[in-house]
A protein has these predicted regions:
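Solvent-exposed alpha-helices and their adjacent loops that cap or buttress functional pockets
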Residues: 9-11, 33-34, 72, 98-99, ...
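Short, glycine-/small-residue-rich phosphate/pyrophosphate-handling segment
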Residues: 112-147, 154
Length: 261
């Protein structure tokens, strides 16, 4: 098959499968069928726990999934990833590594946002989402200008620490729902203020839904009346607007910009 200027062998099929929370009941029928048809199933240790007894399951660190898939002799290889293959997923990097070596199929799964919102009985069509799990970004920036923000958390930006950040910014009153180990037997969902959840320890597999009933308007200009010292503005509004435009900033929901002009 000729794809993007390259000839590739298509006698091998790599199936990247989203497994939702990782619990068997969260697997779609398509995912279960694909696993049953595969000659080899590759998974991290955490996801393989729910596939106990399956002889064709091989566990390895995440960084070795693609390498193990390519070195195997199986014609059909299933690779399990958590969540959905299109939502801040490892599927993207896996596809890039496997495309030149065979056909790559992605099978979607449930996102943690869907799981949490379903448990809370709330829609997610108006939610701004971002991932802070091993990534840089600002929950504060997103929460300041949006009514509802969903965030994947982890590492240095864990759920408890993010709630502390909101408290430090004067947003400790905001309503926050925290989902931990969603779908597992030790699942825990808590709802309270950011200040309340900032005092409650949390593991690494957690997500947040933050609600701000009075978000700011990011596009409102700062006028002279907002910058007066005595009766004289510190700078002219036209100068401030021109200076900010020259910075050529792009609005990113997870980022906050600060300027002194």
């Amino acid at each position: 098959m000729y794809i993007e200027g390259k000839w590739i062998m298509v006698n091998r099929l790599f199936m990247i499968i989203g497994t939702g929370s990782g619990q068997r009941e969260d697997f779609t029928r398509e995912a279960r069928d694909a696993i049953a048809r595969a000659g080899l199933v590759l998974s991290t240790e955490r996801l393989s726990a729910n596939l106990a007894g399956a002889a064709k399951v091989r566990t390895c660190p995440f960084g070795k999934l693609a390498e193990n898939a390519l070195s195997s002799t199986a014609a059909r290889v299933a690779i399990l990833v958590s969540g959905d293959t299109g939502f801040f997923s490892a599927a993207k990097s896996l596809r890039q590594k496997l495309t030149e070596h065979g056909e790559v199929q992605t099978i979607c799964g449930l996102t943690s946002m869907q799981l949490l919102c379903a448990k809370l009985g709330t829609p997610f069509d108006d939610v701004v989402w971002l991932s802070l799990h091993g990534r840089k970004g600002s929950l504060l920036g997103a929460v300041s200008y949006n009514r509802r923000v969903f965030a994947l958390t982890g590492g240095e930006q864990n759920a408890q620490q993010l709630c502390r950040t909101l408290v430090e910014a004067g947003l400790g009153h905001l309503r926050v729902s925290r989902g931990e180990n969603l779908g597992a037997s030790n699942e825990q969902i808590l709802t309270g203020t950011a200040a309340e959840l900032a005092e409650k320890p949390c593991g690494d597999l957690a997500v947040l839904l933050v609600e701000n009933e009075q978000p700011g308007e990011c596009c409102l200009p700062v006028r002279d009346s907002d910058m007066e010292r005595g009766s004289v503005p510190m700078t002219k509004q036209e100068a401030r607007w021109a200076a900010v435009n020259l910075l050529d900033l792009r609005r990113v929901p997870s980022e906050a910009f600060y300027a002194s002009v």
